[in-house]
Amino acid sequence: MIAVLFLAILCLEVDSTAPTPDPSLDVEWNEWRTKHGKTYNMNEERLKRAVWEKNFKMIELHNWEYLEGRHDFTMAMNAFGDLTNIEFVKMMTGFQRQKIKKTHIFQDHQFLYVPKRVDWRQLGYVTPVKNQGHCASSWAFSATGSLEGQMFRKTERLIPLSEQNLLDCMGSNVTHGCSGGFMQYAFQYVKDNGGLATEESYPYRGQGRECRYHAENSAANVRDFVQIPGSEEALMKAVAKVGPISVAVDASHGSFQFYGSGIYYEPQCKRVHLNHAVLVVGYGFEGEESDGNSFWLVKNSWGEEWGMKGYMKLAKDWSNHCGIATYSTYPIV
């Protein structure tokens, strides 16, 4: 059913009389298909090829403009090459902000000094990059990432936690599983449930199933959670003093879909209407510290092929770019 829906959307965005394939791109197209194991029927291939060519040429144009100094980041073809932007956003994001329950508020005024650079990966707080697959479950990966970091702070043991446990067991009244969710509700579930399973004991499947949680496989707990005021200054202090922080961003753009490297800045990015959850694991700047070269170090959940081995540098101190500070939270363990 989902595949049929996506194909219908694709047909709306790419006319059924798709243009004749560009023969000069035959080699690139076939290499890309082989690399990602893509197979299509005859009608579908024509549509998918048209989408892929459109994306390929968009990436090439952007990178020429990058060489001319018009952008600070590159784009790169990846596994999402045959997805329209509408398909991509529906399939690969998953943040749905809901009513915020009463919670603690981060007291950023308590911290007067923060370092100029932070990277929690170097201190052992961050698990390897994961892949949510074709499931809009970014909220679950963002939540487990922050919880993994806080459990490491407490126990000095870095244990990957189970996103599938969240997908299967939270209930449809608080999450929509592969159709989106909310990190704070994930923390509330772990608190109420008394634990969260390890990834090893409850591996990721990328679709909702019957809950199979067993308390003996739990490796984390939550006592409460904290909301961070919606400013980059408060977020910076939280990242510096607490550890990896769950945040949401606007990932609606082709430039985000095919981000390659460098400091990401998208003029059309919104500070509200956020749709994708990620994990801020640090911040810093490129070259000499100056205006315009600061970034947030963001861990995504689209595998290591995307971006900088699964990470992004997102523009920092640019009026809350892409809404990175609009909604941010972390658990108390």
Curated annotation (Swiss-Prot):
The protein's location, in the record's own words, is:
Secreted
Q: What is its main location?
A: secreted
The record places the site described as Ancestral active site at: S138
**SMART domains this protein is in?**
Inhibitor_I29, Pept_C1
User: Which positions are glycosylated?
Assistant: N173
| Residue positions of the active site | H276, N300
Q: List the disulfide bonds.
A: C135-C178, C169-C211, C269-C322
Name a single GO cellular component. Answer: extracellular space
What does the entry state regarding organ or tissue expression? Sertoli cells.
Signal peptide, first to last residue:
1-17
Which processes are annotated in GO (biological process)? proteolysis involved in protein catabolic process
Please name the SUPFAM superfamilies in this protein's record.
Answer: Cysteine proteinases (SSF54001)
**Gene Ontology MF terms:** cysteine-type endopeptidase activity
Q: Which PROSITE patterns match?
A: THIOL_PROTEASE_ASN, THIOL_PROTEASE_HIS
- Which UniProt keywords are given for this protein, alphabetically ordered? Disulfide bond, Glycoprotein, Secreted, Signal
Tell me the protein family, please. Answer: Belongs to the peptidase C1 family.
What is this protein's record name?
A: Testin-2
